[in-house]
Amino acid sequence: MSKLTKIGYDLDDVSIVQTPISPIRHRNECNPYRTIAGREMYPVIVSPMATVTDEHNYKTWLDNKFMCVVPRSVDIQTRLNLMNEVFVSFSLDEADSVFFSKTIIEDMANNPGKKIYICIDLAHGTMSALYDVCRNIKNVFGPSIEIMTGNVATSEAYSFYADAGIDYMRCFIGSGSRCTTASNGSTFYPRASLLDEINDARIKWENDHDKPAPTKIIADGGIKNFDDIQKCLALGADFVMCGNMFAKSEEACGQIVYINPEEFDDYLKGKVKGASEEYYHSQIKDLTNKLKESNTPERTKMFQNLLDEWYRMQPYREYFGMSCRKAQRLMGGLGNKTSEGISRPVPVEYPIAKWADNMKSYLISTMSYAGCYDLDEFKNNTEVIINFSGDKAYRK
């Protein structure tokens, strides 16, 4: 019997269809927010990546209406201190020990109404051990602890997540720009088809149990542009998780290096060096002062040329996957496991407030084209078509 009986479509293969009659007169009538962790936020979550979020900048994301997940590179005591305010990451072993400790059990018992938000952060989200740990946490703490976990690349996992009471399921494997799981390990499912099938699985679970499904769907990985966010939401995702988009913002926490864009490839090959942020600004200041003080045309020209060379350099941020060896060391490991991630700088392009405003504007515009007032309508009612020309027909 042939194994190749299914065809899968990725996000580039689909597009959203305009409704024939839209009741929406102006896009500002559309509501682009969802509630998560007790907050009204955009349906976009910041990935738990060491070069994007830490204990110093997580509030910046929250202030701009993006839920975030504090990564495992932050020390465990800090994560424990933050988990009633924001989602924080734990390994499976950490979750299995921490949340069945006497300290946590007594603290939750003595503080009724207290909420904790955790992300059990691992790549392989269909392990039976993961289901067992999540089910046990829910049996002890119920809705007091909200659990996010994953990742999954099969719609058949949805019923297991819902039965275990898991609140958020991260979907996609190997699609992130710094993840090499699919390219080296070959486990992958085209994302548009996966979301569509998982949404069908959610509807089936609700029909079988005659109640709303407890597990929200998070599309996680490889989001390149605003239209990818909209497609994921239209195909059934409740939230979309991004790393690259936030790494490119001024507010991300990763180290910045200044590089001449024309020499970027040579920088990656180690042929030229970049300049640290501190050194870059010191050189700009020093050369600017020398230019002001120059007293001959020759010196003026020399300092101006040097200053122009420095101004041609642009800020790039260190950006690596959380399974690469450097990330392994940041999370307390030896960094000697086979890497399933890569490191490659991204350009720093915008303040997050500007990106958020654009994301919101494009999202509510698309919602108005679909005739949907809120994100549930958008998820349930928007028509999506297979586009055999791919995104080449419109992506600029």
Spans of features found by a protein language model:
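Active-site entrance/lid segments in N-terminal catalytic domains of soluble metabolic enzymes
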Residues: 1-216, 244-249, 287-290, 294
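Alpha/beta catalytic cores of nucleotide-metabolism and tRNA/nucleoside-modifying enzymes
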Residues: 1-24, 186-219, 223-396
